[in-house]
Amino acid sequence: GGYDRKRDLEDAMLCAAPGMKKNGFLRLGGGEFSLPYTVICGCHPRKTVLITAAVHGGEYVGIQAAVELADKLKPEKIHGRVILVKTVCRKEFEERSGSICPEDEKNLNRVFPGNPQGTRMDRLAYEVVQKLHSAADYYIDLHSGDDYEQLTPYIYYAGCADEDVVQMSRKMAEQADVPYMVKSNVASGGSYNYAAACGIPSVLIERGQMGGWSPEEVHSTRKDVRNILCALGVYDGMRS
């Protein structure tokens, strides 16, 4: 009847045994997209936090922070589940094409919620919504400045959503050690904006610039994420 083996397989990829960590490639869109990911399941059931990097393929601070978080977060300290997708725009990252997909000349973070019948970025956005947003209770999206962007570290929080979602998004943003906090005023286009409009408290961290990264920037982003996880009760520990 309604048995969908492919969908069941995709759902199973986002699960691990309690107290375990699983690494692999998440196949989306019938195999069109293959995204490196880690899922860490704690021993205690609670909420799921989705963390994504490389929604823009040339923003390296978030990628390296996600790689290190996947390595350093300890399953025994997790209450719930953490899903880390280390490179959403994997092909664009590998081809060093920055924030624009050469195939359709679209910016992934402008086309959410996507369209399964659209061009490449439309299809990827649709798959992210269907398979990743749908699994999340909270969402942290990691960005930095592309090779033409200078910026001071800051954090966006969702502003166009139900009031309880906005307030929780702001609470998440307050955990980040950045000079500026910005309330978003759009409900679609961006991955985290659309997730929030669907009821998922969401933030976007910006740190790093001009297509570069440093160990200090990566460490700061890791610390911000850890502090958000602690504030959500998903990770054991004190604010650092």
Residue ranges and their predicted role:
Residues 1-240:
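Structured catalytic-domain cores with a bias toward divalent-metal coordination
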